[in-house]
């Protein structure tokens, strides 16, 4: 499957890194108006969090070469002007963060592209979380969203608990690593004053739509979950805290057993499970969407519990982007 990437930021680069180990995904083109092929090679080779690229890299004026394979590079601002057709592109990963609606993302479809996967939540595109609602994908859907990294962490956990015990209501907090939209030092941020404070020096309360978005992928939970975020000064790996009231009472051990079973069966590779004394950096490079920390959670009563699940908000999410593309291809 010929795939292109629009936007060579954190997710764009990590989708490319992950694809290098996936024989089913053939990245043939990248578009980024601000990055030359020389700089693109450098950005791919060196990564503060994930280390040096494990493979060979080179470039010429119009391509980068990954393990000897040419990847065409475009530098267009407007998706309508990208000549995807010259590289027989079938799928586009839209990872700029700028084209997240059906209308905007659909501009890629004018260039011979069959499908677009938005690597962000969307207000109107069908949204899918692998392991949760991906089976609802239909081949007449040409633009879809892979939701957010936090929704990808929360939704599998919420699905298992809701299917087994029922969730009456819940509040989610994500303790989230720094992202590119934050300021390294205090700077102007008109809409979110706290978000303009230095990311390296503060714990910053922030809003997130991730919990409410779970209601889109699990309709039975619509209106039952909401949440907020704390941005913290770490480079990667975040953690979800889901505090929920259950419909059917259950001991914490019963909840652990249900999640462990799902992690070994229907959600294997999506939902992980650990009872070890882990910390955030232990999950750098973990490809699961969500790793349940059995020893970190607590229960006040049999129907009021706090569940904790980790996620590499970069690598895990990028891995799901490729999984969603694979699923779409199989259902054509």
Swiss-Prot record:
* Record lineage: Eukaryota, Sar, Stramenopiles, Oomycota, Peronosporales
Source organism superkingdom: Eukaryota
A molecular function GO annotation: NAD binding
Concerning NCBIfam families, the annotation shows:
GAPDH-I (TIGR01534)
Give one Pfam family, short name only.
Gp_dh_N
Catalytic residues in the record = 149
Q: According to the UniProt entry, what is the EC number of this protein? A: 1.2.1.12
**At which residues is there a site annotated Activates thiol group during catalysis?**
176
**Name of this chain's protein:** Glyceraldehyde-3-phosphate dehydrogenase
Predominant location category: cytoplasm
Q: Which reaction does it catalyse?
A: D-glyceraldehyde 3-phosphate + phosphate + NAD(+) = (2R)-3-phospho-glyceroyl phosphate + NADH + H(+)
**Record: residues binding D-glyceraldehyde 3-phosphate:** 148-150, 179, 208-209, 231
Q: Which PROSITE patterns match?
A: GAPDH
Report the locations given in the UniProt record.
Answer: Cytoplasm
Assembly, per entry: Homotetramer.
Keyword hit for Cytoplasm: yes
Any GO BP: glycolytic process
- Quick one: which residues bind NAD(+)? 10-11, 32, 77, 313
**Keyword Oxidoreductase carried by entry:** yes
Keywords of this entry: Cytoplasm, Glycolysis, NAD, Oxidoreductase
PANTHER family, sorted: GLYCERALDEHYDE 3-PHOSPHATE DEHYDROGENASE, TRIOSEPHOSPHATE ISOMERASE_GLYCERALDEHYDE-3-PHOSPHATE DEHYDROGENASE
